[in-house]
């Protein structure tokens, strides 16, 4: 029962997820380890890590970013979903991580900041990451939580862990039988 897109990515439910992590930032440290192993073993693969801005307040994330920059892991692409919200409220009100792109550049990361709702911008940022040699890539995705669904995005931080009813789902999909 439930969704294959739970609030925390689950490798047992979501295709393409190789490791389950959570809100404490361990996922990036593991991604750095996977990318480093690929370099040591001379394997030709990319490692992708998706973080939220709330979990990016964790010290472990900053240690992993610094290490990735120092190791020049050009086979690692990190996305940070910068929707400016976390479970307890607005990220800036709790513990601001801005200016995120400037901090990442100081760690020797190839850093891009884009509209996270623009698919073409994401594709271009990925191509730029693939073309970058000797630097880990970090892509900051500026997003709006609930983008495109007014009755969700208007809730602000209150939509962080909200559930929707079956009736809301049907209304959103515009179908009686979903």
Regions found by a protein language model. Give the residues of each.
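Cofactor-binding active-site loop characterized by glycine-rich and histidine/acidic residues
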Residues: 1-70
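Conserved thiamine diphosphate
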Residues: 42-45, 92-125, 175
């Amino acid at each position: 029962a439930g969704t294959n897109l739970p609030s925390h990515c689950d490798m047992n439910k979501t295709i393409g997820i190789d490791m389950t992590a959570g809100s404490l930032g361990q996922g990036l440290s593991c991604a750095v380890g996977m990318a480093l192993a690929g370099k040591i073993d001379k394997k030709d693969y990319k490692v992708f890590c998706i973080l939220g801005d709330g979990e990016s307040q964790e010290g472990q994330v900053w240690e992993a970013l610094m290490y990735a920059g120092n190791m020049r892991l050009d086979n690692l692409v990190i996305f940070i979903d910068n929707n400016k919200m976390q479970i307890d409220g607005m990220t800036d009100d709790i513990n601001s991580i801005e200016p995120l792109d400037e901090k990442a550049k100081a760690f020797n990361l190839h850093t891009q900041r884009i509209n996270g709702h623009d698919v073409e911008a994401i594709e271009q940022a990925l191509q730029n990451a693939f073309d970058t040699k000797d630097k880990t890539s970090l892509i900051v995705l500026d997003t709006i939580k609930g983008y495109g669904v007014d009755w969700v995005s208007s809730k602000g931080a209150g939509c962080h862990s909200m559930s929707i009813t079956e009736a809301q789902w049907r209304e959103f999909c515009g179908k009686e039988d979903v």
